[in-house]
Amino acid sequence: MNQRIQLSDHFTTSRILRFAASPIIMMVFTSIYSVVDGFFVSNFAGKQAFAAVNLIMPFLQAFGCIGFMLGTGGSALVAMTLGTGNKKRANELFSMLVCATAVLGVIFTVVALLVLRPAAVLLGATAELLDDCILYGTIITVFQTAFMLQFLFQSFFITAEKPKLGLFFTVAAGLTNMVLDFVFVGVMGLGITGAAAATVISQLIGGIGPMFYFARPGNGGLLHFVRPVFSGKALLKACTNGSSELMTNLSASLVGALYNWQLLRLGGADGVAAYGVIMYVSFFFAAIFIGYAQGCAPVVSYHYGADNTDELKNLLRISLRVIAVGGVAMLCFSELLAAPLSRFFVGYDAELLELTTLGMKLYSLSFLLCGFNIFGSAFFTALNNGIVSAVISFLRTLVFQVTAILVLPHLLGMNGIWLSVVAAEIAALFVNAFFLVKNRKKYQY
């Protein structure tokens, strides 16, 4: 019998996997339509346009991650409030966070448009790439608010016990992006203009569509819009809770720029294009872990708010086993599929194909460990300990990766760039283990 799973339930391995299935599929599908986007740009607009898109992408993602921060941090706060039994307050907090995200989205859009050109130059855009960077970046930036709201609602659908509805909006947005990529880029030959247009239309579906659902008080979920009651303390708490996710995404943008700089220095535009392919593929594999962590987080927050320590122990134990098995499976799959996946993107250029395949095989070693580090950070966010979560993310995604990217290429050349993420994940695993052991008595997991 397929009964509805609730946050208050006792979770077995199969039950938590069922509950996390929708956010996992949601994240995987998001990565798939990003891959399709890259495929059409690379194969129909050329590797120069593909390199330009990947060069400006870190800047665009840096602004969009505000929605991810408020979504993950805010959903942890709202889920904990639901766990205490105060549903009215939970809806007030939810409504306030949506309004705050929309306002911040408008502000950041204006700022991003003003600094887009100097940012592209700073990221290393050459004269050949600059115009394409500006064109793609401008179209995406104008609709940045929808992008932020899309990330926000992905987290809150899980908290509202409506993960399948969140999946529906993600699939609808993704299919729209894929179809429009085919029409705009493949058929009409609009190049990166068409790719950008396809992306923003899909973001409008994913970011604006959920508002119609949450506007209905009797929507069947735990959350709906009410008159927002502003609370600076609650907003700060949500930001603190989600600071690790903000740090992860900001660091990813900075590290991505640093990767591109090193790759331009050692491999030229081909190096940047190869990195773009590896990022698309790695996001697909990492999305499984991210989706699982997103699915578990509201459950952890709820039971933490309800002071159910036995269930916290159970959730942590199950999750570590699931991640260990998943890491081994992903490593095997990524090594086996490195060549065919590289050929899918850059099969038209033999030299670029060889570079991409080797880079992907080395980079894929990180999949064995990254799941533990992704979950560890999300676990502390769910416990409303944003500081520990942020420290883990800061060290993992910024300090360790930046150090590795700056040092390893001098020792190993181009291979050192691909192995930088592996070194960072190994170091982060020790940090994660330290904090899990250190805080065990405090949270009684």
Can you say where each PLM-predicted feature lies in the sequence?
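Short runs within selected transmembrane alpha-helices of multi-pass transporters and secretion channels
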Residues: 71, 139-158, 166-177, 195-210, ...
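Helix-terminus/linker motif at the lipid-water interface of multi-pass membrane proteins
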Residues: 32-50, 120-127, 183-190, 246, ...
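Membrane-water interface regions at transmembrane-helix termini and the short interhelical loops
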Residues: 153-161, 181-193
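Alpha-helical transmembrane segments of multi-pass membrane transport proteins
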Residues: 14, 29-30, 67-68, 108, ...
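Short alpha-helical transmembrane segments in multi-pass integral membrane proteins
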Residues: 1-23, 78-145, 187-243, 300-366, ...
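Small-residue-rich hydrophobic transmembrane alpha-helices
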Residues: 50-110, 147-166, 274-338, 370-392
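Hydrophobic transmembrane alpha-helices of multi-pass small-molecule transporters
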Residues: 62-65, 109, 177-182, 207-211, ...
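Transmembrane helical elements of multi-pass membrane transporters/channels
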Residues: 18-37, 139, 173, 202-206, ...
